[in-house]
Structures are given as C-alpha cells and as structure tokens.
Amino acid sequence: MSFNFIKDKNKHIHFIGIGGISMSGLAEILLYHNFTISGSDMNSSPITKKLKDKGAHIYIGHKKENIKDADLIVYTAAIASDNPEIIEAKEKNIKLMDRADFLGDLMKGYKYNIAISGTHGKTTTTSMLSHVALKANVDPTILVGGNLDIINGNVRVGKSDFFITEACEYKSSFLKFFPYIGAILNIDADHLDYYKDLDDIKNAFSKFIKLIPKDGYLVAYGEDKNIQSIIKEASCNVITYGINSGDIQAHNIEYDEKACGNFDVVKNNQKLFSVKLNVPGKHNILNSLASICIGLASNMKDKDIIEGIESFFGTHRRFELKGCKNNITVIDDYAHHPTEISATLDAAKKYPHNKLFCVFQPHTYSRTLTLFDDFTKCFDKADEIILADIYAAREKDTGIISSDMLGDKLRDRGLKCTNFHKFNDIKNYLIENAKDGDLILTVGAGDIYKVGEMYINL
C-alpha cells in the first residue's frame, strides 16, 4: 500500500491516534491540502480541538463506526492489533498504513528532505534548524515532535521543495524515509524492547545512511564512537562536526549565567562566524553545530544561520522555564534516557540555584529495566532526587521493575532520594522542602510536568 499526494487527493483519510504529536502534524498537512480528514483518540486535547477547528472530524474513543467512510487508515506503532478500528478496517478491506510508511510516501513529494536522526536531541535540533530555514526564507514544510512558538505548533506547510522532519529509529521507522540530507546526532542504547542490542541499533543507522543519495549529505557528530564505526557506509557527501574534531567545530566556548554557550564556528581552522545560544548546555552546542552544518550544506547565508540559531529559545518541554514561585524556579525537561538526564542535569547545575531538586518519572517499564544500571548513575549532579511511579505509555506492568527499586539503588549509593506514588504528595513535599533560590527540575517523557504546574499554580 502506498500514498500519492496527487492520485489520492479526493480520498478520505482516517488517523487512529490523531492526538499524537506526529499524527496530528500529518493530519494538519493534509487538511491544508484540502483532504477529507477524520481521526480518533482516547482523549480530547488542545491538539484534537485545533484539528477540529481546521475541519477534521474527531472521535473520542476507538469504535468501528468511526471509520465507516474512510478510504485509507493511518495508525501508529502504539495502536494494538485488537483495536476495533483496525479490526473493522481489515474486515472491510479498507487500506491500512503505518505512520512511518505514510510519512515516507509524503516525503516523496519533496526534493530536499532533511531528516534529523539520533537517540537524543532530535526535536531540539529540528526546531533549531526550522528557525534557520525560516530566516533563510526557503519556505519549508516542517514536522517536529514538539510545539515550536515560531510556527505556532508542531507543523508548518510551506510551498517549496524543502521538508524538515525528525527521523525516529524506534521500530526502524526512519528506514522508510527518503532523506536528501540525513543527520545523525548520536547513537546510544535505547528502545531495547525492539532492538537486540547496541550493535543492532548501529546496524539500523547504517541502513539509514545508505538511504541518502550520492549527491546528498550526511551530517554526523564525528566524536561519537558509535557513529565513527558506521560513517564509512556513506556513499554521499559527509560533513562531520564536534568540539575538538570534525569539519565544523565550536571553539572558544564560553557560558553565560544561564549556561547558554557562546562560541566561534570554525572550518579548516578558519573562523566562519560567532554565535550566541539562548538554550543551555554543551548538548545544545552540539545540536546547533548540526543545524549549522545543514544550513551550510543547503547554501543558506551565514547571517541567516546566525539569526536562526540566536532567535531559538527552545521548544516546549525542552529545558522549559515553567515559572517561579517564592523565588523558586521550576524548569521542565523531556529527558527520559540516562544520557539525556545527565546532560540536562549538567545544564541545570550551571543555572543559578541553591539546591537542585530533580523530580523524575521513568518512562516505560522496558526502558527502566534494560537501562537500570545507567539510571542508577545519571542523577549524581542533583542535590535531591524525587521519583514518581513509572509512566507505562504503551506497556503493561509485569511487576518486574518499579520506581521503588530504582529509588532503593540510588539510596544505596548514598544519594538523597524519596519515592512518591501520587503527584499531589510530590507537590506537598516540594512546598515543605524547597527554599528561596532553589531549582525544581521535572524530568521525563510522561506527564511529570504536571507536578511543576501544580506547584506554580498554588
């Protein structure tokens, strides 16, 4: 089954899980092009309301009746095979497409597809690059995994041949894409509920590299040893970046009082220009270098690259300042992998504060189990750790792993750590223990941000 922008113009397309960040973006692109769109989700949300306002037919709850007029159904990996709409579609021979296949077919309508891959930093880098592309007036279509203020959401429909999107490796989704420029930000062990091991993950990224045409570009973090081992697979143009090595480097790095980096961009030991970031941490210096490399490969002007990078103040849920209460700062971050948590805490330590509270909600049982040892070692820079229960997402609790088990290990290592089972109890603990000048950092890919909002809105 395939999708064609022109041939399928009069089709009714139904999205199962339309409230998801990527699915809603795809639906919005099609609504712009006057497709008939419907979709279902378990809960109403600002996303479903926005789609409804744009003309989509939205159903809350999954029922077989929802797909009665659909010609094509798009679903995500999170949708189970016993979903009533999936079952009904099969019985009625309505065409079904996985989200990644659908996005891949959508990309065929564009010449300059830019796909940002990597275990960490995809949303931030895609968002940063979007700022650069908009400053350069290339009029791109953008699909990003977070809400970006400059496009008032997670999607923008342009009229040029530029398409900018994230390329997630989960279930090898990114192997269904058609990148002209493919970026690999880093490679780390993750999604081990799908991949066998790190070598299996590296093999998937090797295949991603081979998708890039000979006249295209691979942009890669050259100081990542896992990337170094597969970069030879490229038959296209290759641009590497890094702090101490690579084609494009960051020199003379200085951090301001909020941990945001200022640095010179250097190529072949020659300074190209300087930039001042408005997002914190070393990891965002690397994210900006990837964006700069793509901008240069796309023949964007230096001044547009600089303005794009410097106008980027972050996306929602990426080191997002939620507010202050009694001179106590609350920041939220989406980090859910040990490497991401370490980077986020490193940035937070550079941020002005007295005591750093890290409120963490583990994301999925499988990730917590497979990366358990790494989770026990990534919180050392926090002064105090508060653990919520594991956010299940698409999984079921088998009783094998829990937040309490992680808390026990952290306490065994001498770290101050407290477990709570209810958000309200976490809020009350913070009310009692956070003092003037402290920093509360909520961390996780689930709904832990609600704790910060509860605290701010007292």
UniProtKB/Swiss-Prot annotation:
Disulfide bonds: none annotated. ATP binds at G118, T119, H120, G121, K122, T123, T124. It comes from the Bacteria. GO terms for biological process: cell division; cell wall organization; peptidoglycan biosynthetic process; regulation of cell shape. It is found in: Cytoplasm. Its EC number is 6.3.2.8. InterPro entries: Mur-like_cat_sf, Mur_ligase_C, Mur_ligase_C_dom_sf, Mur_ligase_cen, Mur_ligase_N, MurCDEF_pg_biosynth, UDP-N-AcMur_Ala_ligase_MurC. Its main location: cytoplasm. Gene3D superfamilies: Mur ligase, C-terminal domain (3.90.190.20), Mur-like, catalytic domain (3.40.1190.10), NAD(P)-binding Rossmann-like Domain (3.40.50.720). Keywords: ATP-binding, Cell cycle, Cell division, Cell shape, Cell wall biogenesis/degradation, Cytoplasm, Ligase, Nucleotide-binding, Peptidoglycan synthesis. One of its GO terms (cellular component) is cytoplasm. Signal peptide: none annotated. Pathway: Cell wall biogenesis; peptidoglycan biosynthesis. It is an enzyme of class 6 (ligase). It catalyses: UDP-N-acetyl-alpha-D-muramate + L-alanine + ATP = UDP-N-acetyl-alpha-D-muramoyl-L-alanine + ADP + phosphate + H(+). The keyword Mitochondrion does not apply. One of its GO terms (molecular function) is UDP-N-acetylmuramate-L-alanine ligase activity. Cell wall formation. Belongs to the MurCDEF family. This is UDP-N-acetylmuramate--L-alanine ligase. It comes from Clostridium botulinum (strain 657 / Type Ba4).
